[in-house]
């Protein structure tokens, strides 16, 4: 597939491979590259950054809007979380197809098609009349956004060449880091000033600009001979994940996991996922995801760590803005500003993590990162349980979490491919990228379900919904309130705050426990650097 673009971008076979998802094949023949970053390359990088930042910012923007969706659509957190879950499932679906699609259509056309799909999805989201259509249109966005990062890397790898790739990726990485910092602020400001629909409408001029610039700047490339696509694998994995998560997400409304409306889709989804695993294991030619890579112990441990870590991490991240808005009574704009310490922590740790990984290899820095995430998330949970004000506990926890993310996510991607042969790097990178998205999608659904369960078991919160004391109240939407249902105690507001804080604290503690559990597989990651060891080759 188009994994050759990444392999040729590596200076030497013995060097540590770059942990990315490839999607481009260079043209046959030799090509000479200048040593400096010329104007043409910087223009190409600028277009790639414009589109990729748009997709990255959109994720953080939508997380800030979760409570607004609950109020405007009269829905629950478990249902609204599908605006994130559906998007991440779409990412997990298209990432394995990126290499085949770029071979089939060419990287230039695929990039432009992905930008167009994301922009069209943004427009549809902006006009969605109900939560169901908003979720569906978010999936459309995800199909476009999932292609942008791997295709952008393939284009940059082809245009930069091996000697300039590191420098151009450093240039590209700066605005990519600013996305998670600026996204919550932008989203909060747009929601407060113009309404939630503008968090999607703002993508239209950016997407159209990226589309026009790509048509002008990117060199034309012809489609190449592509591998046979694993349609069966795609038809098993995507519906399996969606059906399983739909069943789990239905449990709060049913009151029990034993309800048939929960069990039937959950069991059906698990059966489809099991069938996908069996299909991928025995498919010898070009499976959607090469499950045989799990025979490599380092690959198995890195992917297990990434999946569970994403489950706890992404699930808790979804609820951070909701907690700030619902319990601390912050506006969307304020909650966006108060999440900034997380991005600042990540920016601070980036150069340190990179230097440590180069000197020590990924295993040790991954352990440090996981411990930092657990410490930060635990600190945040402690502040929530104590009903603490924002300062100083909560920003401290967020900053530590941000540092831990940088020290764990990227090194884990490196650990997943460092023992693979060059021809296996593409598949290994795809595998861990998919598991990151799958873990994140399960985490967003699971944590929202747990929070909804906590809400449903609180009589105070249930009463508050009726009297418009929470954003999802019936009275707030014009429903009649029976005065006899109101509580007699005088400290109702204090008790409501206690129950809300307790509900969020329980979920954050569970997320912390999941993060801590990843120390077990992470402890067995290979301690040597890639240049010091090479695992036996698996079959191609």
Swiss-Prot record:
Keyword Protein biosynthesis set for record: no
Family: Belongs to the major facilitator superfamily. EmrB family.
Location in or out of the cell: Cell membrane
The keyword Membrane is assigned to this record: yes
GO cellular component, one term: plasma membrane
Keywords noted in UniProt: Cell membrane, Membrane, Transmembrane, Transmembrane helix, Transport
Gene: emrB
Domain of life where this protein originates: Bacteria
TM region positions: 45-65, 78-98, 117-137, 171-191, 198-218, 229-249, 262-282, 304-324, 337-357, 365-385, 390-410, 431-451, 505-525
Organism of origin: Mycobacterium tuberculosis (strain CDC 1551 / Oshkosh)
SUPFAM superfamilies: MFS general substrate transporter
GO molecular function, one term: transmembrane transporter activity
Gene3D superfamilies referenced in this protein's UniProt entry, alphabetically: MFS general substrate transporter like domains, Multidrug resistance protein D
Pfam family, one: MFS_1
Signal peptide: none
Record membrane topology: Multi-pass membrane protein
Protein name per Swiss-Prot or TrEMBL: Multidrug resistance protein B homolog
């Amino acid at each position: 597939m188009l994994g050759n673009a990444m392999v040729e971008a590596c200076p030497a076979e013995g060097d540590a491979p770059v942990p990315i998802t490839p999607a481009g094949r260079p043209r046959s023949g030799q090509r000479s590259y200048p040593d400096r970053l010329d104007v043409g390359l910087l223009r190409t990088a600028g277009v790639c950054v414009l589109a990729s930042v748009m997709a990255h910012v959109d994720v953080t923007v939508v997380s800030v809007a979760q409570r607004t969706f609950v109020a405007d659509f009269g829905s629950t957190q478990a249902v609204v979380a599908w605006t994130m879950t559906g998007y991440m499932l779409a990412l997990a679906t298209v990432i394995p197809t990126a290499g085949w699609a770029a071979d089939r259509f060419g990287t230039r056309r695929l990039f432009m098609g992905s930008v167009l799909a994301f922009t069209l999805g943004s427009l549809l989201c902006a006009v969605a009349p109900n939560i169901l259509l908003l979720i569906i249109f978010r999936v459309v966005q995800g199909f476009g956004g999932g292609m942008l990062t791997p295709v952008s890397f393939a284009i940059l790898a082809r245009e930069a060449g091996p000697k300039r790739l590191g420098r151009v990726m450093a240039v590209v990485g700066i605005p990519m880091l600013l996305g998670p910092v600026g996204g919550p602020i932008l989203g909060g400001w747009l929601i407060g000033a113009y309404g939630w629909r503008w968090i999607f409408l703002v993508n239209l001029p950016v997407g159209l600009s990226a589309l026009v610039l790509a048509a002008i700047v990117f060199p034309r490339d012809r489609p190449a001979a592509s591998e046979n696509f694993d349609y069966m694998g795609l038809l098993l994995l995507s519906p399996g994940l969606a059906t399983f998560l739909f069943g789990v997400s239905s449990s709060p409304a049913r009151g029990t996991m034993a309800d048939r409306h929960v069990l039937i889709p959950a069991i059906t989804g698990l059966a489809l996922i099991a069938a996908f695993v069996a299909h991928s294991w025995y498919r010898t030619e070009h499976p959607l995801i090469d499950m045989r890579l799990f025979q490599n112990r380092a690959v198995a441990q890195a992917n297990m760590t990434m999946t569970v870590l994403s489950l706890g991490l992404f699930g808790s991240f979804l609820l951070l803005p909701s907690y700030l808005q619902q319990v601390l009574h912050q506006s969307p704009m304020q909650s966006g500003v108060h999440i900034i310490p997380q991005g600042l922590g990540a920016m601070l740790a980036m150069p340190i993590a990179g230097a440590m990984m180069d000197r020590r290899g990924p295993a040790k820095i991954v352990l440090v990162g996981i411990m930092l995430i657990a410490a930060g998330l635990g600190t945040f949970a402690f502040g929530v349980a104590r009903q603490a004000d924002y300062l100083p506990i909560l920003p401290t926890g967020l900053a530590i979490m941000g540092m831990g993310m940088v020290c764990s996510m990227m090194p884990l991607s490196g650990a997943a491919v460092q023992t693979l042969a060059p021809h296996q790097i593409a598949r290994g990178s795809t595998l861990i990228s998919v598991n990151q998205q799958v873990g994140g999608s399960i985490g967003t659904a699971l944590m929202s379900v747990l929070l909804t369960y906590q809400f449903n078991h609180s009589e105070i919160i249930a009463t508050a919904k009726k009297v418009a004391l929470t954003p999802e109240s019936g009275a707030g939407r014009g429903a009649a309130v029976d005065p006899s249902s109101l509580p007699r105690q005088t400290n109702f507001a204090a008790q409501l705050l206690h129950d809300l804080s307790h509900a969020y604290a329980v979920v954050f503690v569970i997320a912390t426990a999941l993060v801590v559990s990843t120390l077990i597989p992470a402890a067995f990651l290979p301690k040597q650097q890639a240049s010091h060891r090479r695992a036996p080759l698996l079959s191609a």
